[in-house]
């Protein structure tokens, strides 16, 4: 007779069960750590994107507020009060006071060391007279051409009933607003020129986020500046009325969206695709998976 198979001893069974328990525990721990890591990286990636939206929109809002402060300061300047009212004034003194009040070379106006947010500003009084200040020097011939352009913009604006008026030309956006004296009576017009290069610099980090979009508009949806994706998605972005931070479907993808109103009727909208979060997780986790 053949001998029957020898049954495993209790010790062998115990070792097997112990090893099995260790392996299963290690697998469970590894899976748990992976899930926690993915959750952590996801939160971190989302936080980074939200910080970018908040930081960039904050920088833009700060510069628009600086514009508002400039315009408000004009009616409180004793020399410019007389100019705005069309009363007797010293032309040279008015120009100097206007340049000092607007101060286009201030840190508040600079996006970087070479890019002013406002590159030129004109103030017209009731009589159609003007003073101006500009960041870049101009030839006499070009100054005369610029004066004519701003006079035409002023004339077109005053024919409208709008509080604000916008025009884009030659990679610039012109923002027009009515100026009031201390009695809040309409006394003139201020025209501010914003250069595209400075605005592009302010939003330059969006190039690091594929498929991201941003859009700057006037109060009636006129596009002042936008990146290519922003132009493509302008209609859908402008349909979003609940401004602030939210998740919105734009095109075929979900996005982290920010929309906000600033001064002079200007609005900013930005959107970053949510799939950037997963792309960030992938790039972070991938080295450990190899």
Predicted regions and their residues:
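N-terminal sensory and localization modules of signal-transduction and trafficking proteins
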Residues: 1-12, 40, 44-48, 162-166, ...
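Extreme N-terminal signal-anchor transmembrane helix of membrane signaling/transducer proteins, especially
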Residues: 3-43, 47, 289
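Extracytoplasmic/periplasmic sensory segments of membrane signal-transduction proteins
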Residues: 47-55, 59-153
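Solvent-exposed, extracytoplasmic
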Residues: 103-115, 183-225, 229-231
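Generic short beta-strand
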Residues: 121, 177, 213-215, 221, ...
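Conserved beta-strands of PAS-like sensory domains
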Residues: 133, 141-150, 168-207, 268-273
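Soluble sensory domains of the PAS superfamily and closely related sensory modules
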Residues: 147-162, 236-249
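Extracellular/periplasmic juxtamembrane segments that couple receptor/chemosensory ectodomains to their
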Residues: 182, 208, 219-220, 228-288
């Amino acid at each position: 007779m053949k001998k029957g198979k020898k049954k495993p001893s209790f010790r062998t069974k115990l070792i097997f069960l112990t090893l099995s328990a260790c392996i299963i525990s290690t697998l469970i721990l590894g899976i748990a750590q992976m899930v926690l890591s993915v959750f952590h990286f996801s939160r971190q990636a989302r936080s980074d994107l939200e910080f970018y939206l908040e930081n960039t929109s904050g920088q833009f809002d700060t510069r628009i507020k600086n514009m508002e402060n400039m315009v408000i300061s004009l009616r409180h300047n004793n020399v410019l009060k007389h100019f705005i009212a069309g009363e007797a004034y010293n032309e040279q003194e008015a120009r100097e006071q206007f340049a000092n009040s607007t101060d286009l070379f201030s840190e508040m106006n600079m996006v970087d060391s070479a890019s002013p947010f406002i590159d030129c500003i004109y103030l017209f009084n009731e009589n159609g007279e003007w003073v101006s200040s500009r960041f870049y020097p101009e030839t006499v011939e070009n100054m005369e051409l610029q004066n004519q352009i701003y006079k035409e913009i002023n004339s077109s604006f005053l024919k409208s009933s709008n509080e604000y008026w916008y025009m884009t030309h030659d990679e610039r956006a012109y923002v027009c607003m009515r100026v009031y004296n201390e009695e809040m009576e309409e006394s003139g017009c201020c025209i501010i020129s914003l250069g595209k290069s400075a605005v592009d610099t302010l939003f330059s980090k969006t190039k690091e986020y594929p498929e991201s979009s941003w859009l700057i508009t006037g109060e009636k949806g006129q596009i002042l500046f936008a990146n290519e994706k922003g132009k493509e998605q302008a209609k859908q972005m402008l349909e979003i009325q609940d401004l602030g931070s939210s998740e919105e479907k734009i095109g075929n993808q979900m996005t982290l969206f920010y929309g906000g109103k600033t001064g002079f009727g200007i609005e900013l909208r930005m959107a970053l695709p949510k799939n950037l979060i997963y792309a960030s997780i992938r790039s972070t986790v991938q080295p450990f998976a190899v």
